[in-house]
Swiss-Prot record:
Keyword check for DNA-binding: no
Extracellular compartment residues: 1-29, 83-103, 162-199, 265-275
Disulphide bridges, residue numbers: C100-C192
Transmembrane segments: 30-52, 61-82, 104-123, 144-161, 200-223, 241-264, 276-295
Native source organism of the sequence: Gorilla gorilla gorilla
Record function comment: Odorant receptor.
Family: Belongs to the G-protein coupled receptor 1 family.
CDD domains xrefs: 7tmA_OR3A-like
Taxonomic lineage: Eukaryota, Metazoa, Chordata, Craniata, Vertebrata
Subcellular location: Cell membrane
Protein name: Olfactory receptor 3A2
InterPro entries found in the cross-reference section: GPCR_Rhodpsn (IPR000276), GPCR_Rhodpsn_7TM (IPR017452), Olfact_rcpt (IPR000725)
Glycan attachment sites: N8
Keyword Zinc-finger: no
Length: 315
């Protein structure tokens, strides 16, 4: 603690992250599980990215967005898990105020990018299935890059806004965060100044970055389902529903966990449920996305096989 009377600056120099478990025996188990999940996530997502880069058949808009999703998944799990593994190894549970802000910024940057990227992927499927004749012109490489660039810009603005707003709050103790990473709901509960403005910003951001994209995704897929049902070929319907079903599964898991985390700001204390949802958001989702979305795809599997046997090269 570094109290500064008469100023509006924080008095907390570091936070104590209570983590997932407190007993030493369980910490060893958690360390092994997290390390395994991290390695699987990195391996799976980098494999997808490599396949998209080297296989000409995968040089299509859908796979361009999938490659970007893989990069996001690697970033999302890297923001939280390596630091947690380090704390488990060193048996230190503290994180500095600046490191906490940095983790918060990058977490919201990547989560916000996820929102917009999933929306762009829904738009891509809408054009491919409902507007096939104009798909190649309306979803050309320039449009793809513009969608990704706009997504990064909006996500960066959102993350920076929340981070700056958090620096205006006073933290004068206690400094124990009942979580395994720094996030807004848990930090709001520790602030000894009013969090109304920060919470208002969070709800506005939720409307812009969660509700609006979710409505757009729902409307897009309503049109997609109507178009798919008009396909006479059973094989064509199956292929279309398979692609759309994978995307909707990812959307459902991502938005479901996000709503649970950020729509419960009125609760007095963080609970173990918040930690479980946090594990889903930062560990399980990035690990499952390659399996749900890409590794079930025969084209991706074929590209990975060629990469492994040396028929394709990254150079």
């Amino acid at each position: 603690m570094e109290p500064e009377a008469g100023t509006n600056r924080t008095a907390v120099a570091e936070f104590i992250l209570l983590g997932l478990v407190q007993t030493e025996e369980m910490q060893s188990v958690v360390f092994v599980l997290l390390l395994f999940a991290y390695l699987v996530t990195i391996g799976g997502n980098l494999s997808i990215l490599a396949a998209v880069l080297v296989e000409p058949k995968l040089h299509a808009p859908m796979y361009f967005f999938l490659g970007n999703l893989s990069v996001l998944d690697v970033g999302c799990i890297t923001v939280t898990v390596p630091a947690m593994l380090g704390r488990l190894l060193s048996h230190k549970s503290t994180i500095s105020y600046d490191a906490c802000l940095s983790q918060l910024f990058f977490f919201h940057l990547l989560a916000g990018m996820d929102c917009f990227l999933l929306t762009a992927m829904a738009y891509d499927r809408f054009l491919a299935i409902c507007q096939p004749l104009t798909y190649s012109t309306r979803m050309n490489q320039r449009v793809q890059r513009m969608l990704v660039a706009a997504s990064w810009t909006c996500a960066f603005t959102n993350a920076l806004t929340h981070t700056i707003a958090l620096t205006t709050l006073n933290f004068c103790g206690p400094n124990e965060v009942n979580h395994f990473y720094c996030d807004l709901p848990q930090l709001f509960q520790l602030s000894c100044s009013s969090t109304q403005l920060s919470e208002l910003l969070l709800f506005v951001a939720a409307a812009f970055m969660a509700v609006a994209p979710l409505v757009f995704i729902s409307v897009s897929y309503a049109h997609v389902v109507a178009a798919v049902l008009q396909i006479h070929s059973a094989e064509g319907r199956k292929k279309a529903f398979s692609t759309c079903g994978s995307h909707l599964t990812v959307v459902g898991i991502f938005y479901g966990t996000g709503v649970f985390s950020y729509m419960r700001l009125g609760s007095v204390e963080s609970s173990d449920k918040d930690k479980g949802v946090g594990v889903f958001m930062t560990v399980i989702n990035p690990m499952l996305n390659p399996l749900i979305y890409s590794l079930r795809n025969t084209d991706v599997q074929g590209a990975l096989c060629q990469l492994l046997v040396g028929k394709r090269s990254l150079t």
